């Protein structure tokens, strides 16, 4: 294991490999609905899977979603499933992975680069790392 309170951080290549080769792996996008609508979302259709969407925090106040555990439970996923959490940059997804691990989910990973990745030298996201920059499938609108 590791010294983390969840299964660990994974990069785009490892996440895609898990989603592709582990039939009981799931991607949970825990960004806000505004981000899903305006920035785009991971597209797993060529794997025969769907991304699950459950907000960790709600826009615009960014308050923690008190129904997060309930909404995850309603997805019907086993606590033994491999769950990969993704947010914009890896912070909220880490919190979500830790939270669910503490609630009995055994294989919660943080997509540590996030959907948009780190800031570049100009303070913009999307050009350094992350889901989009790694050329993994995504869609907008």
Show where each model-derived region lies.
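Rhodanese-like catalytic fold shared by cysteine-dependent sulfurtransferases
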Residues: 1-26, 33-82, 93-141
